[in-house]
């Protein structure tokens, strides 16, 4: 057992002790009753709606907003977070802060109470149950965690989380040279479920199809993706390579809306997670506007997520009560291809929790050369720059990285922020 195994096993044990058991044994049984019973669903959300002081909508349909009046967005929270943070009470006495930079590179800190973390785990667990997973089953994890020092340990870039029976694999070391190592590790572990970034599992799947390699594990029931937009072409590639259905989970650090995929591929808006309304954007696209039911420490109402969905009028054959959308149009980060062939997707972890970063952008110049562009806050120090470079090297290995302080980061022609910018021809 290496140090990474000890670290992640202890982390899982402590999380299970604090929130996991409560989520699975108390919250999950209650919310599972909402799936096929409109009456149970209405009964569950009614007290939540009363507390948020909004009217009760049809729980099985999505309401459309006439205008953006009365909505809030990320900028409002960043500028005045204290106005959204609630005073301490008995129910919110235990709280913590979670940080994200998302697709904008602008660090955002959300205060959440312990009950929020417990309920979040319960809702995610319900999604995993839809995919055929039960607690204790073998699971593989291919996301943004630093689980390797850059060298394979017993042939794999990763470690075992013994407490949760999980094979933790690095999403930063996948390349044409290492893909077979990953597949061999998956075959030996033979997981029931794989949880992954779409870009990470897609890198393996596309290599498998290009090299006519079949997945040889015989227990895999499903792959659950999250944290990035899952394109349909990417989903089809993954399903073809691994021979199982891909389930996708949509959520955000603000905890105002969630969408889960069922066994028929329907994208269900979980109306027992938060109150979701639709704000017309363009053509047939609508922005998700959510009101949190779960977080009592930081109440967010009518929050514009910035993520778009396309509606449909079909009834999902699974029979669940939750309304569906056709597709989710969220973040589309570029992928960086390093000199050794590794493809790197999400790097927003670099800026998480960086209080002195107003905005951040990752620029790749080719040949393992990075520029980390930063709009710095007034308390910026040299140590902040050193920490950013250290975080980058922890994830992608030893590369050349420089921090560039700028007054602003230009938007593209469409006015959108480009979190990962590739300037290899510069």
Identify what each model region corresponds to.
Residues 1-99, 105-138, 145, 188-195, ...:
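Nucleotide 5′-phosphate-binding alpha/beta core
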Residues 118, 140-200:
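AMP-binding/adenylate-forming
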Residues 138-140, 289:
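Conserved beta-strand elements of the Class I
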Residues 157-158, 212-215, 264-268:
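Short, hinge-like loop/turn segments at secondary-structure boundaries
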Residues 171-178, 191-235, 248-253:
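Adenylate-forming
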Residues 180-183, 187, 212, 348-351:
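Short hydrophobic/charged patches on amphipathic alpha-helices used for structural packing
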Residues 194, 284, 296-399:
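AMP-binding/adenylate-forming catalytic core of the ANL superfamily
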Residues 221, 225, 230-315, 332:
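Conserved AMP-binding/adenylate-forming
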